[in-house]
Amino acid sequence: MGFPPRCIGQKIPEGLHVRMNLETGVTEAKLISNDKPKNALKMIEDESNNFPEKTSSESENRKTSYKNYEELKKDFNELNLNPKTDAEILRELIEKHVDISKQKDRDEEEILTILEDLEFLVHQYDNANDFVKMDGFKTIVYHNLNATNSEIKRETLKLLGSSMQNNVNVKIHALETGSVDILLRILALDTDMSVKYRALFALSGLLRDFPYAQLKFVENAGLSVFSKLFESDNLKIQQKMLTLINDLLQEEIDSKKDTKQVEKIKQYEDIQLRKRLIVHNYCDHLNKMIVNSVVIEANDHDIIERCLGALYLMVDDCSSKLTDKSKDIVLSLRNLYRKLSQNESVDGDPDYFGTLYDLSNAIVQRIQKIKVEL
C-alpha cells in the first residue's frame, strides 16, 4: 500500500498519521481507522477545494443557503469525523488480530493489513511502548512467528524491528521475553531467505546500543549462526551481517572514549566480541567477502566500502590470515581510488573516493607495518 506524500504547508487532517520513512527519506501519511468511510477525506477535500466565485445574486441569497447548527452537526456525524487516539487504534487492531486468528479459515490478507498498520504506528516511541503494554509481543509478534505463511512472518519481523528502533524499553521487553533465541532460530532454520533477511533486521534493532543484548547474543551461539550464513551464497544477507558487526565493533571503540561510563565500558569488555569473532573464523569470512565484493559487485563502491571498513576494524587480528589474493585486491583498490579521487565525484561529493582511498591506504600501511614487526 502506498502513502501520499505530505505537501509542504498542508494541514494534516485529524486521524491522519504521518511519519518519515528513514529508508527513503520520504514523508508518508496514512489514515488508520476501520470505521471511517473510504471517501471521507475526499468529501472534505471536495468541500474545501471547489468554492466557485460568488455572483451578486448568490451573495444576496447567501444567508438563505446557510445551514443551521443542527444541520451542520448532522452532516459531520455522517462523516464520522471523531478522531481516535493512537492508543485506541492500537488496541482495536490488536483485538481485531486476535479475533481473526481464532477463526478456522482466517483471512490472511486482513492479518497482513493489520500488521502493516501496526508497523506504521510503532515507529513512534509512545506507540511502541503502548504496543508492549497491550501485550502485543505475545498476542501478535510471537504468535505470528510460528505461522507457516512466510509473508506474515516477514511483516511480523518488520513490525518487531520497527518497534525496537531507538526504544530501550521495547528492547528490554524483547530481550526478557526471548527475542534473541527466537530470531536466531529463524536465522538458523527458516528456509526462506527473505524471512531470514527480516529476522536480521529485527535482530539489528535489538542489538544496537544494547550491550547486554549483545552479550546474550554471543552466549546463545549467535556468532555460530552468523558463521553458517557467511558460508552461504547469499551476498545480500552477508553484507547486512557485516554492517551489523562493524557497528557493534565501533560501539565498543566509542565506549572507551568516555572514561566516566565505567559500567558501560565493562559491559562491552564482557562481550569480548573481537576475540569471539576470531574463534568463529571471521577473518576467513572477511577474505571471502573482500574477493566477492570485487569479483561480483565490482561497481558497487558502497559494498566495497563496507568490506574495507570491516577489514580496517579487524586488521590487527586478521592481517596474518589474509590471503595473497585479498592483499592484492586491497592494493588494487588503493590505486583505483587514488585515481578516482582525482577525477570524479559521487552525487556531488568530491571526497567520496578520497575517503575510500584513505581507508584502503590505511589498511595497506597497517598490513605492511605488522609484517615488518613480525
Where are these regions (language model features)?
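Alpha-helical solenoid repeats of the armadillo/HEAT superfamily
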Residues: 2, 7-73, 102-119, 148-162, ...
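Internal amphipathic alpha-helical repeat/solenoid segments
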Residues: 75-152
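Buried hydrophobic core positions in alpha-solenoid tandem helical repeats
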Residues: 93, 97, 139-142, 182-186, ...
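Short loop-to-helix capping motifs
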Residues: 124-125, 166-167, 210, 317-318
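Recurring C-terminal helix/loop segment of individual leucine-rich repeat
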Residues: 129, 172, 212-215, 275
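Extended intrinsically disordered, low-complexity coil regions enriched in Ser, Thr, Gly, Ala
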Residues: 132, 272-274, 327-331
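Helix-rich alpha-solenoid scaffolding regions
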Residues: 132-185, 193
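Residues that form ligand- and interface-recognition hot spots within folded domains
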Residues: 135, 221, 230
